[in-house]
């Protein structure tokens, strides 16, 4: 009797691979369910997964079968009504069809397949195919991430790392070194034996010939006893770890908290930034987040104050952009950091300030930034700030994005549009 001992690390989750394969197969249905769930839920309500419904017809697997109609010969095992040679009448046209609408006292069907995805799987599908654009600046950081590279060869290693060619060369060299003297002596004895055998029968010394043959046999056996391949011959690829260059990024979150931003508009802005915060924290380990709130004066605040402070005032958008410029110059060298910014506002701004915002973005900020995104939360006609930003987008189409949000249901769609993964 044979025994199978399961030493897998995921012993309590033996179906993990099958589950991953299942999620991959029904990816389209799951992504649609996640998108619908986000439109129903609050962005902060992400403490649980989601129930996924898959229609029964989508669960069926493809298979080959005979189509209806035509002529075919078939063998029906276990038939008690017919014998070979009997002719079976063709059913009347449409006889194989259903009865259409109406109730039935027979038949069966299948319900939808329902299963639950975890919170981690929900977030994976939620942020699937999203990325911070243009993250190209990389450097060596003090991290535990490494990449392996070829660093020569070693006499020890795992069987999978054996260099076959180098091992065979080493074995061949060892055999030559260990048998060289014996082969030379063997060659000399064989030559001497050949000379003795070639003499006239009267002059042959049979005793000497037998002695030579015995010596030759002994030497050959000694040569054969040298192993063809020894543990000493095995050479293994040596792979060494070296620190991998890591991308380092900072995201500036700029939110308008002026008096023109009513409570509903502020809630939409907060939801957008909560979604951005979750996205960065989940997908990028080495990304710092700088929170800036502004009315007439801009302030750098912590996460708690950014989302929950009730301070308000007038509107000067350029104050936030100027503060962002100062922080970059003081703390984030351009050669080391990928710099991003996301701004949310209702579009209301002091009239003369929109031109100042355009100048700061075009001359001071965007040449240093990897990406700047702006969302305007308003159901009304756009104001001067939007039109000024349109001119900025015309000059920087690859690094500047702007979208309008009317209500909370559009947040996730706009977020995916801004941060969709770019194919290079």
From Swiss-Prot:
Residues 77-108 are annotated as: Disordered. It holds the Pfam family DUF444. InterPro entries: UPF0229 (IPR006698). Belongs to the UPF0229 family. PANTHER family: UPF0229 PROTEIN YEAH. This is UPF0229 protein Ping_2705.
